[in-house]
């Protein structure tokens, strides 16, 4: 599997699908430029998504919300306090690690610490003698939360009043514009609002190649429905998404849907799941 993946990466780089970002200046880790073929491929996927999710369903509309939003949006959504990763430093080699990923890696994925408290993760790492993957040491600092949003400043002053964030997801723009869309298009629920756009997350442990990058593009739709019908609609859209992926060429034998356990759900969710393809996870 690893050799096959390496061949795919090599082919993508050599044929103009993807280039290393800032390559002639030494590159910048976790950044990638899409070449001519890469752009065409992305555009075809986005066109297919727009056609299936927006154009073929009269209940759904598309918007383009701003990347920069009033910080009160992120305060109201809980991102300022809750959108964070649990980090530990190795005191021996000074490397930084996500506590949850240390546990998942050490247990070969058999233990999922999502929803655990910092204390529970610290105790598990200590009791199971989980070592630093870089030096093999067992001396970690206490866990602290690191916010994943990129912070910058609006205007000429760099102070608290000028603080602004690059959006970590596209969803909030659709929530904020819900009333505007409903009024302008005289929509009645159920209906969906979709958009395609860039999002940014200051990932501590980015993934391999173009997976889990700090700058990425999302195709997302928020579907608004009457209370009490949400689980029915969830079931409908879950199958809809799976059908869309297989129609794009995904092999059904290599795909499965995993419902998240209750302890994995964030405070905003009643139900959630993900499509899993050969251990590569694509969030629904």
PLM feature segments, named:
Residues 2-284:
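TRNA-recognition modules of translation machinery and tRNA-sensing kinases, especially anticodon-binding
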């Amino acid at each position: 599997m690893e050799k096959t993946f390496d061949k795919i990466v090599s082919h993508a780089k050599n044929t103009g699908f993807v280039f290393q970002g800032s390559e002639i200046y030494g590159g910048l880790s976790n950044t990638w430029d899409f070449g001519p073929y890469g752009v065409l491929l992305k555009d075809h996927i986005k066109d297919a998504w727009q056609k299936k999710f927006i154009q073929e369903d009269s209940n759904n509309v598309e918007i383009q919300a701003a990347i920069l939003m009033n910080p009160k949006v992120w305060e109201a959504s809980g991102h300022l306090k809750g959108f964070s990763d649990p980090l530990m430093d190795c005191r021996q080699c000074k490397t930084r690690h996500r506590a949850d990923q240390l546990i998942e890696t050490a247990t070969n994925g058999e233990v999922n610490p999502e929803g655990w408290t910092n204390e529970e993760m610290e105790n598990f790492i200590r009791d199971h003698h989980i070592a630093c993957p870089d030096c093999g040491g067992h001396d970690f600092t206490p866990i602290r939360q690191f916010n994943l949003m990129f912070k910058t400043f609006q205007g000429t002053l760099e102070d608290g009043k000028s603080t602004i964030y690059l959006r970590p997801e596209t969803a909030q723009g659709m929530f904020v514009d819900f009333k505007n869309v409903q009024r302008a298009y005289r929509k009645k629920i159920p209906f969906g609002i979709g958009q395609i756009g860039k999002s940014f997350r200051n990932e501590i442990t980015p993934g391999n190649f173009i997976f889990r990058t700090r700058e990425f593009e999302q195709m997302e739709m928020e579907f608004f429905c009457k209370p009490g019908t949400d689980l029915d609609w969830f079931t409908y859209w879950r199958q809809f998404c799976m059908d869309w992926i297989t129609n794009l060429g995904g092999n059904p034998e290599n795909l499965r849907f995993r419902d998240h356990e209750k302890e994995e759900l964030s405070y905003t969710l009643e139900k959630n799941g993900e499509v899993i393809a050969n251990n590569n996870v694509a969030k629904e």
